[in-house]
A protein has these predicted regions:
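Surface-exposed helix-capping loop/turn segments at secondary-structure junctions
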Residues: 41-42, 85-91
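Charged alpha-helical initiation segments
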Residues: 1-69
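Long, charged low-complexity segments
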Residues: 1-32, 89-244
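Short, hydrophobic, well-ordered secondary-structure elements
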Residues: 32, 64-88
Length: 244
């Protein structure tokens, strides 16, 4: 029995594109709210007396919101990009999609490149920063044990996470990517075309247009020999079928 094909346009659960977009929006809004709360606490900190017992609480809240807002925004990017990866892989099996996501990991810039998003070099670098936030900077303690190096690294990380210019640029980039992704398969001026060829040996799903790169996905029958899984075989089979 063949594995279930789950990436139809109305997939379920984690293979529902709309669900990924919804989660992305929640994370995005949460990141912005946290950042605003952090800025409010920084103002309270600046106005408070250094001897006030609540000063340490203000400091902790400011540091926590700097870090957590960046982590959430990083995950918002990931949910947004993976919603488009799902769409690009229409017709793929569950295992193939899981492998695709596993291979990407948290490499947001790689997803953006594969999706053909029209981003600048600086915007791709910003996605790399968001990837590092997810993997390390906004997630795990610093791994340095030397006291002097630890303090230096901690200060650099805190300054970078607190940088409002970086956060604002990330928010703007998210908005840009979302506006592009929202048009995938929804633009009347660039409609997507879907075709399927079902033969006894394999099923071929093909998509082009819709704002995404053209892609063909092949699902071989369970008894299809491994040695024959070649592009040359597929080309010959398609040509023979087209000639009928």
């Amino acid at each position: 029995m063949q594995s279930e094909i789950i990436t139809q346009k109305n997939g379920k659960g984690i293979f529902d594109r709309k669900a990924w977009l919804t989660e992305s929006k929640k994370l995005y809004l949460s990141a912005k709210l946290l950042r605003s709360e952090g800025e409010r606490n920084k103002k309270l900190l600046r106005a408070a007396s250094k001897k006030s017992p609540i000063v340490h609480e203000y400091i902790d809240i400011a540091s926590a919101t700097d870090q957590t807002s960046r982590l959430m925004l990083g995950y918002a990017f990931e949910m947004l990009l993976k919603s488009a990866i799902l769409l690009m892989n229409l017709g793929a099996r569950k295992k193939a999609i899981e492998n695709e996501f596993c291979n990407y990991g948290h490499k947001l810039n790689c997803m953006a490149v594969d999706l053909g998003l029209p981003l600048t070099v600086d915007e791709l670098k910003l996605l790399k920063v968001a990837s590092r936030d997810i993997v390390l900077n906004a997630r795990y303690p610093i791994g340095i044990v030397d006291d002097n190096k630890y303090i230096t690294e901690l200060n650099e990380r805190n300054i970078q996470l607190a940088d409002e210019n970086i956060f604002r640029d990330m928010v703007s980039l998210y908005d840009k990517i979302k506006s592009i992704v929202a048009k995938f398969d929804n633009d009347v001026a660039n409609c997507a075309n879907f075709n399927m060829l079902r033969l006894s040996e394999f099923t071929l799903f093909m998509r082009n247009g819709g704002g995404l790169s053209s892609r063909a996905i092949v699902i071989f029958s369970d008894k299809f020999p491994e040695v024959s899984k070649r592009k040359s075989y597929l080309k010959k089979a398609i040509e023979e079928h087209a000639g009928k």
